């Protein structure tokens, strides 16, 4: 047995019988050290020394490794009222220190159930606070269903995106965001794919399959998807902040204007060392189907210095936190979900 990802039972989830997935995850936990035994007197006779083979030592190591494995049960189910606070926590990983009403956004996500999935710890008859902790969230949310009567949190999301794009994105990306906001046709969705940092990626195929199944059944099909990814860029290359996928480097020498600086940053970032917090996010840029544009912006000023989401060190190199705003068409999004369904990314 290991971690089990399944549907929650009981009255809390009675309406969710269609969402059943099961798989096993194993996570290693540090075992508490036992007091070291008193040293035994050394024997002066070689006859008392027991010869231990390498195979026996390996077997002992394997036995100890098995003892260090702990089992945790997790459940994947449609968002409900009990998950509200946990969903807010997941959303704050995407939107750092913003004026967006996360609670209203969480309530909107819950109202779309049974669309979407949250990952929570399984519980039996006795419930604890940990039973209501959300470990992951995967869903979509229409960004432009009703232009005139959009909820405030939707307007705040567009304000956030436009402000970030104005500082560092090419003009066409800024205009694209404006066009999405003005359309009001419900054909643009926000893809939310959040998990606790370093949560096993074995959950991805089931999460993506659930989203793909739901989206394929929507009456109003998404034509455009907005996705905000979490990533880190190697220190020394953060000057590429605000860089984009959509422009070529300038050929002109001498003093550069704002547009040319953005092009230069875009060209430099193509060779930057990047670590994605969600490993599956890298796949999106390896696909050939459909189209996407993106730009990156730094968020280190929005993260507490001691936070696990701040700068990390890997192989002696520091990586600083960024966000990547991706705008993709339905073909790229569908291919991304399909790829995520087919394989586990590590």
From Swiss-Prot:
Any one cellular-component term (Gene Ontology): nucleus
Family membership: Belongs to the BCP1 family.
Basic and acidic residues bias locations: 11-25
Organism: Caenorhabditis briggsae
Ranges annotated as biased composition (Acidic residues): 37-83
Name listed for the protein in its UniProt record: Protein BCCIP homolog
Region of interest called Disordered, as start-end residue ranges on this chain: 1-83, 238-260
Basic residues bias locations: 1-10
